[in-house]
Amino acid sequence: MRSSDQLSARQRDILGFIEEFTQEHGYPPSIREIQDGLRISSTSVVAYNLRALESKGLIDRDGRVSRGIKIKNMTPMPLSRAQGGRVPLLGVITAGQPLPNPEDTSTTAVEMIEVPVDLAPPEKLQNVYALKVRGHSMIDALIDDGDIVLMRYQETADNGQMVAVRIEDDNAVTLKRFYREGDKVRLQPANVTMEPIYVDAARVHIQGRVVGVLRSMW
């Protein structure tokens, strides 16, 4: 059981806010949302207290993404968004050469999109988020520019799975099929006109796996 011993009042408030926000929305809050939700004077104060919570073993953080906060041993509960067949649209992903991630997921207004029941039953939408596709590298997999991919958050993948990948140092995010080849990873486009991308495995961080597609009709 998680202990709250030696927590300041502010740290208890932040921990409670993160847990309530995550249960309600299905994804963790950004630092800005914590600041606004608790009326804290600055994001630096929030960041300081998040570091304290992490050092006390109560949360895990991935500082490379804006919503990289996880409460340890938190038991998932049914999400209100799942009952409505809705998932958060968290930004844009490139289906082409990797580009710096253009999304800004630190805003307080997160767009929610409807997922048809015949595509995914509401109870299957736990830990699922959406990204809008930019580019044509996955066209042979029937994913084109303007489509929306549904991503199940996970940090590992099997060979051949279609994943969102962040490339370290470049801070680039791309949508490709994943293949581990020794100490390299091959990021394979589904477009015969495009070449695969080879990256050191240590620089590749999986952000999620494609579990569905909402196709643009434009």
UniProtKB/Swiss-Prot annotation:
Active site (UniProt): 137, 176
GO MF entries: DNA binding; serine-type endopeptidase activity
Example GO biological process: DNA replication
Assigned keywords, A-Z: Autocatalytic cleavage, DNA damage, DNA repair, DNA replication, DNA-binding, Hydrolase, Repressor, SOS response, Transcription, Transcription regulation
Site feature: Cleavage: 95-96
The enzyme's E.C. designation: 3.4.21.88
DNA-binding region: 31-51
Entries under InterPro entries matching the protein: LexA (IPR006200), LexA-like (IPR039418), LexA/Signal_pep-like_sf (IPR036286), LexA_DNA-bd_dom (IPR006199), LexA_repressor (IPR050077), Peptidase_S24_LexA (IPR006197), Peptidase_S24_S26A/B/C (IPR015927), WH-like_DNA-bd_sf (IPR036388)
Catalytic function, reaction form: Hydrolysis of Ala-|-Gly bond in repressor LexA
Annotated Pfam families: LexA_DNA_bind (PF01726), Peptidase_S24 (PF00717)
Family according to the record: Belongs to the peptidase S24 family.
Protein role: Represses a number of genes involved in the response to DNA damage (SOS response), including recA and lexA. In the presence of single-stranded DNA, RecA interacts with LexA causing an autocatalytic cleavage which disrupts the DNA-binding part of LexA, leading to derepression of the SOS regulon and eventually DNA repair.
Subunit description: Homodimer.
Name of the protein described by the UniProt record: LexA repressor
Naturally occurring in which organism (per UniProt): Roseiflexus sp. (strain RS-1)
Protein's gene: lexA
